């Protein structure tokens, strides 16, 4: 299994060795390092993907002139102060390892012995917390200026790659608002309101729709890419045209920041279920594991995943389909409990495993501290009122 270990990067003190599962949930307070962890992991996955589909020169490039760490800082817009001589990144991937010691050294990148025979092509997608800018800011794709390719510009380019697919005849119904469909017309984003037959630019949609719509569109289209031909240059096509493992996408990897943004609790539930269902679809189509990394502050997101985990646990224990539980457990749409992982980032920058292996459930205690405060203060006020 793929693992990553990060020390002394931004607020992260020592993550320990964290395994990348099909669904990996990261919980923590503001500025605790959730995005830092996910961005470092995404960068390592991207470098591995690049090496799997490109020629030998890519590995050599990332191993010299500090390219690995400098491209990490630039692309993900890290403050240079996040890194120091004590920083450490150890990535043990599918077919390569990356080790970065300090901030002023070259990364050591090593290919595993079976690299040549087993390398494959995958599709990566980082959906940042700033995703609603494509809806909230008019003509952002023309007004956003970056001297170098960074995470936001890359997101805009990826959005341009997928949005044209959803025409008026191929609109996408949103899970967070079933009466709303998204489509693109002449490069402009619209939503169609089925209850009154009206359309309006996404610019005028609610903040919840503006935040969820990019996630729903990206996961729908990117999961559909699995098994299809990859978009490669003519040079790369000549190299991989006879190798379907590299010519076709074998999996998709999502990195999604705070999917709950601006959403009502029930809509959070619908979005998470949609995300997981698309993950299941991608894993059925691909020859390699597709995965999703989520960061969250939301107890509702944790609760929804716990329902899925409890259903998965039942299916694990009762693998033979039972019609009597059809209204409770969906055997066709469940992911075994072993494919869920969840961690909490403590105040000291270390990781804590939140999965109870016996139940299994994700502990939500760290997210629900406000309930104790509410209960304590209401109790005190009630004593004053009622004696």
Identify the meaning behind each predicted range.
Residues 1-168, 174, 285-289, 303, ...:
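P-loop NTPase switch/coupling surface
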Residues 15-21, 194-195, 244-250, 282-287:
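Phosphate-binding P-loop
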Residues 257-259:
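Walker B catalytic acidic pair
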Residues 254, 270, 290-295, 298-304:
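Conserved H-loop
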Residues 92, 129-249, 386:
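Extended helical coiled-coil dimerization/tether regions that scaffold
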Residues 215, 270-275:
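Conserved hydrophobic alpha-helix in the ABC-type ATPase nucleotide-binding domain
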């Amino acid at each position: 299994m793929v693992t990553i270990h990060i020390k002394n990067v931004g607020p992260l003190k020592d993550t320990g060795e964290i395994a990348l599962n099909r669904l990996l949930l990261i919980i923590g307070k503001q500025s605790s390092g959730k995005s830092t962890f996910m961005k470092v992991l995404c960068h390592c996955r991207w470098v591995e993907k690049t090496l799997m589909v490109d020629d030998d020169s890519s590995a050599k490039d990332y191993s010299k002139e500090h390219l690995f760490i400098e491209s990490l800082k630039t692309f993900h817009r890290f403050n240079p102060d996040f890194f120091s001589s004590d920083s450490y990144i150890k990535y043990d991937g599918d077919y390569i390892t990356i080790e970065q010691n300090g901030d002023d050294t070259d990364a050591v990148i090593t290919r595993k012995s079976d690299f040549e025979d087993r390398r494959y092509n995958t599709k990566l997608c980082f959906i940042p917390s700033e995703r609603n800018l494509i809806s909230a800011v008019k003509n952002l794709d023309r007004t956003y200026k970056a001297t170098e390719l960074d995470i936001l510009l890359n997101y805009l380019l990826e959005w341009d790659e997928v949005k044209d697919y959803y025409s008026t005849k191929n609109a996408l119904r949103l899970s967070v608002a079933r009466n709303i469909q998204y489509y693109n017309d002449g490069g402009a984003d619209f939503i169609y309101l089925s209850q009154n037959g009206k359309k309006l630019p996404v610019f005028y949609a609610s903040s919840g729709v503006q935040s969820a719509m990019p996630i729903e569109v990206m996961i729908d289209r990117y999961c559909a890419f699995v098994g299809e031909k990859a978009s490669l240059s003519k040079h790369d096509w000549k190299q991989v045209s006879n190798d379907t493992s590299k010519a076709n996408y074998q999996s998709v990897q999502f990195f999604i920041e705070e999917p709950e943004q601006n959403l009502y609790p029930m809509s959070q539930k619908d979005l998470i279920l949609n995300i997981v269902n698309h993950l299941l679809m991608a894993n059925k189509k691909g020859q390699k594991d597709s995965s999703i990394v989520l960061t969250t502050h939301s107890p509702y997101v944790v609760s929804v995943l716990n329902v899925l985990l409890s259903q998965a646990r039942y299916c694990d224990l009762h693998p033979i389909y039972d019609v009597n539980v059809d209204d409770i457990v969906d055997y066709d749409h469940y992911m075994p409990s072993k494919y869920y992982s969840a961690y909490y980032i403590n105040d000291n920058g270390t990781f804590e495993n939140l999965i109870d292996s016996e139940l299994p459930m994700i502990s939500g205690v760290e997210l629900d501290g406000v309930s104790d405060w509410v209960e304590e203060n209401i109790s005190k006020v009630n004593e004053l009122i009622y004696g």
